[in-house]
Amino acid sequence: MNNIQLLKTEATIPYSISLLRKILMDTPGMDEWDETNKHEVIEKFPEEGGIIRVIEYLFIKFPLMMDNRDIVQEKKIWEEYNGNEHNCLIISKSIEHQSHPPQKKVIRGEMILSGIYLKENKIGQTDIYMINNVDLKIKTGADLVNKVAKKKPKEFIENLTKFCKKCYKK
């Protein structure tokens, strides 16, 4: 059975790319709104050539009777300003990192490729296109997990939107 999941979604939300980028790059703050994963910054690099680079550890809590998963990933962010257009691309993929080797009782998943593309369509509105290609190394119960996984991108956008609304009120 193929365990690789291709998950995708798109949405338009009434918040600026600047706010979304700030929230999506605040790795520890993501725990406040992304209920699926626990996030930790392993390493953050100085901006180089307009690219921001971060190494993150994600811990994914699974239902009872299933082993939890984790992923170490590199995240890169590009921003582009062309006149009135503002775009942002966030790409993540799995890597190995000496500070976070695989653990016993936690299965190391693989983020084959994850991408979020943000495109400003009007002042204060952003189109979000999101795609994840992930292998969580599931052997049993894969059908159930796959059903749940298909809902995750939409939940991610909903939680992000709620958090933006909360931040915007501040």
PLM-predicted stretches and their roles:
Residues 1-170:
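Eukaryotic helix-grip
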